[in-house]
């Protein structure tokens, strides 16, 4: 929508996007994520992208921006989606503010994508178990390995995303409000059918993608 005002604060601005107002963090002039985010809020934004939430001040402003009706997108350095929520709590964000402002958490990893020249990799069950596979995962398990050809050189071509997509369900919200930890949030996510990063990666491997 041409009328939608999309503004970002990034460190650094890696890609210039037409139609989007982008600001780069610059510590030399005290342009931090928090200060840039405050400046963005004075420009009547519809969508805000904060490159990274690194401290409590930035987290608080991002949460308040969400609570006042803005769509806020950001990143945190954590191991998976449940730990992202725990990270916000550990930073000092009140649980009720998290449940009121956060709607979706996505954890991402990138793996090398196997090229079409791949070939089946047949390993004995003992080797797979030694690599961390569970016995219940070995049935009809087919993995692949890189070969290499004129189209890829080393058997790989690009990257494939491995994701954990965790909506903030009512069950997860209750755990957050009760002061629960990342392990409890992860258990609730599994019970609601949300695959973790390991399960997502295993599916991509079975599909011959990585």
Locations of regions flagged by a protein language model:
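Short, flexible helix-loop junctions that flank or precede catalytic/ligand sites
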Residues: 1-210
């Amino acid at each position: 929508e041409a009328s939608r005002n999309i503004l970002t604060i990034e460190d650094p601005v890696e890609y210039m996007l037409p139609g989007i107002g982008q600001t780069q963090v610059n510590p030399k002039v005290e342009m931090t994520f928090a200060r840039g985010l405050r400046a963005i809020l004075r420009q009547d934004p519809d969508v805000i992208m904060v490159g990274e939430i690194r401290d409590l001040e930035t987290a608080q402003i991002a949460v308040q921006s969400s609570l006042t009706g803005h769509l806020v997108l950001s990143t945190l350095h954590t191991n998976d989606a449940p730990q992202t929520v725990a990270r916000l709590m550990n930073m000092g964000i009140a649980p009720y503010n998290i449940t009121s402002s956060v709607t979706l958490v996505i954890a991402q990893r990138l793996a090398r994508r196997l090229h079409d020249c791949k070939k089946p990799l047949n390993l004995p069950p003992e080797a797979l178990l030694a690599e961390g596979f569970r016995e219940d995962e070995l049935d009809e398990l087919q993995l692949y390995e890189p070969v290499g050809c004129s189209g890829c050189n080393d058997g790989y071509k690009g990257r494939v995303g491995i994701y954990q997509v965790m909506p903030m369900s009512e069950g997860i919200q209750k755990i957050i409000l009760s002061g629960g930890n990342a392990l409890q949030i992860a258990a609730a996510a599994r019970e609601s059918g949300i695959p973790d990063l390991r399960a997502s990666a295993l599916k991509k491997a079975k599909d011959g993608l990585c």
